[in-house]
Structures are given as C-alpha cells and as structure tokens.
C-alpha cells in the first residue's frame, strides 16, 4: 500500500524558508505587508509542497467571522436571476461587497412557514450579516435573524424594524407621475395590476380589506399612491379593478393580465406596480393582435433596462444603487461603524411611449 500523500502546512513552509508562520500567513491574508519577491517565493514553495492555502473553516473559528454576507429574499433563485430589478439590486450588493463573499438565502414567502423552520434556515447560513430584500411584515425569518444576533439591513420592506436600517424610495409618492400620466391623457377606466400583497396566496381580484391589511407595503403603497391620483381626478375607487399576481414570473404575469383585460374589456389603461407585470400585459395584447398604446395605455414601475429599451412609460428607481447602499451599510454595521437609520432613494418618471390620449 502506498504512503498517504503529505501536504505542506504553514509551519513546514516556514521551516523550509527559515521564516515565521506569521510571515507565511501574511502572504495569503495581508500581502501588502510583504515585498512582492518574498510573497512570490512563499507562494512558489507552498505550491511545491502541495499547500492549498488557509483553511476557511479554521479561519472562521479563529476570527468568529464567516467572511460572507447574505441576502434574504422570499423568492426562488430562478426569480433572483430572471427579474431584472432583482438582478440590478444583487449587482449593487455584490459591488459593495467587493472581496466579501455573497450568499443568497432564498426563503419561502408562504404563510405556512413557521418560526422553527425559519430559524433553522437562518442558523444554517454561514454569514456575518444579512440584507433583507423585500420581505413581508411579520415574516418569521426576520425574527430568526434578530434571535441569532446578526446585523441586518432592510431594502424595500418591511419598513422600520427596530435596529435595522431601512433603504427604499417613497413608493406612494413615486408612482404618482405614472398615474397622473394616465389621467392627463384622458383615461378614466383604469385597472391596476400588483404583485404579491400578502403572505397568504392570492391570484386574481384584490379586496379592499386585503389591500388595507397588506403585509407587503411596497405594493400596497404603490396601489394607494395611484388611487389617490385617480380619486383626485374624480374616479370612484370602487370602479377601479385591482388584480394581484402572487408569483412574479412571465407565465403568471401573462395570466393575470389576461384575466384583468378579459373580465374588464372596457378598460382603456392599466397601471402596473412593476415593469414585469407591464410586460405580461404587452405579451397578452400581442397574443390577441393588439398593442400599447394603440389599443391600451400602460405604465410600469422600476425602470429596468428592458423597460427602457421598450420605451415603457414607467417610474425609474435606482435598483443597483439600492443594492449598493444596502451592502455598504451592512458592512459598516459588521465593522461596528455608524450608519444612517433610514435612506430614502430618489426616483424619476420616464414618459416613454406606452400612454396615448383616449
């Protein structure tokens, strides 16, 4: 039987080169403290001796840090990489993280998730802190993060959790220009499409009670902001149909658009709380030989690259900046630096070309 292969260690590399273990360690962890020549000599010797570098598990036990931050989102990973607003947000977090590893923590949004399973998910995440991205009020994962004592920053929702900095635009105010564009174009028969309002599943019509008690306040505030503009224009809020898409993906967005427009064929305009829903409307219109704005005026919210390329009438929010601010704030918290308790992001209105006079 052959002898088991022996790999180099910090001590054996140090002994061979006649230097200290600390100097060898610095070649990996603090290279700026060594000359380029010495560092290269250490790395070459380590390679010859089969040393693979510092053990991250041993390092985390020694420093009590994982060297990673997490992003908790109540969506599956497919959504995280297909929804353009989320892609931009995660790119911003990654930019802020720099050399710090980024871990995605996908959690179920369902109301059936209990505190035990939420705590288990959070406890299994090897992270030093968490960015909470667009999670419902009362979600058990938030309590689990608090119970573990992890620093946390909230982006979008839920608002104003004690000890957790909050970063978001004023959604109620931000959507007003999109709603006003429809009013100014003469539209009075307007429908609203929203993504998930509550942890309890619902696809289809939204009751006033569900809207008022919504656990996802971003969508609630956008709907409310639009309704305020409509009411100011003399529209009876009871005549404005609101439909919800609980799973935000292409198929479901198409289906909810189809349901809204087939059950309310008199609508001349649709306001969407996210660009993705507006694309569902565009896809449905195309399937029946229609288009926007020729047959229906349409607005979105997010200002994703795809929306701007289509020249959708929409509200632009700085999703990448939001992610960067969230990541930057979390890293400061981990290092016990001062952070602002709340950051309100600016939005802008893109008039686009999907709203036309009635």
Swiss-Prot record:
Alphabetized SMART domains for the sequence: HTH_LACI
Role of this protein: Plays a role in the regulation of cell wall biogenesis. Inositol-dependent transcriptional activator of ino1, which encodes inositol phosphate synthase. Also regulates other target genes, which are most likely involved in the synthesis of inositol-derived cell wall components and mycothiol. Acts by binding to a conserved palindromic motif within the promoter regions.
The protein's name in its UniProt record: HTH-type transcriptional regulator IpsA
GO biological process: cell wall organization
Gene3D superfamilies named in the record: 3.40.50.2300, lambda repressor-like DNA-binding domains (1.10.260.40)
PROSITE patterns in UniProt: HTH_LACI_2
Disulfide bonds: none
PANTHER family: LACI-RELATED TRANSCRIPTIONAL REPRESSOR, TRANSCRIPTIONAL REGULATORY PROTEIN
């Amino acid at each position: 039987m052959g002898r088991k292969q022996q790999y180099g260690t910090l001590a054996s590399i140090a002994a061979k080169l006649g230097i200290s273990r600390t100097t060898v360690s610095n070649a990996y962890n603090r290279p700026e403290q060594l000359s380029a020549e010495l560092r290269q000599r250490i790395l070459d010797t380590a390679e010859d001796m089969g040393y693979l570098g510092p053990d991250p598990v041993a390092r985390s036990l020694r420093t009590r840090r994982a060297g990673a931050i997490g992003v908790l989102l109540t969506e599956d990973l497919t959504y995280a990489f297909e929804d353009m607003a989320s892609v931009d947000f995660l790119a911003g977090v990654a930019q802020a993280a720099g050399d710090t590893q980024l871990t995605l923590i996908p959690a179920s949004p369902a109301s059936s998730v209990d505190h035990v399973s939420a705590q288990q998910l959070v406890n299994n995440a090897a992270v030093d802190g968490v960015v909470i991205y667009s999670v419902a009020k009362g979600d058990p994962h938030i309590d689990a993060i608090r119970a573990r004592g992890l620093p946390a920053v909230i982006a979008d929702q839920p608002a104003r959790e004690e000890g957790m900095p909050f970063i978001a635009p004023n959604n109620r105010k931000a959507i007003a220009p999109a709603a006003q564009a429809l009013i100014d174009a003469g539209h009075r028969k307007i429908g609203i499409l929203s993504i998930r309002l509550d942890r309890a599943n619902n696809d289809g019509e939204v009751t006033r009670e569900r809207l008022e008690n919504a656990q996802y306040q971003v969508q609630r505030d956008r709907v409310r902001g639009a309704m305020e503009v409509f009411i100011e224009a003399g529209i009876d809020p009871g005549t404005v149909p609101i439909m919800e898409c609980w799973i935000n993906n292409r198929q479901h967005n198409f289906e909810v658009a189809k349901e809204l427009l087939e059950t309310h064929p008199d609508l001349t305009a649709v306001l969407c709380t996210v660009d993705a829903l507006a694309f569902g409307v565009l896809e449905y219109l195309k399937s029946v030989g229609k288009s926007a704005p020729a047959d229906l005026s349409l607005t979105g919210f997010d200002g994703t690259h795809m929306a701007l390329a289509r020249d959708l009438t929409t509200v632009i929010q700085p999703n990448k900046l939001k992610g960067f601010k969230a990541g930057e704030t979390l890293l400061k918290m981990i290092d016990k630096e001062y952070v602002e308790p709340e950051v309100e992001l600016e939005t802008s209105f893109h008039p686009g070309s999907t709203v036309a006079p009635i």
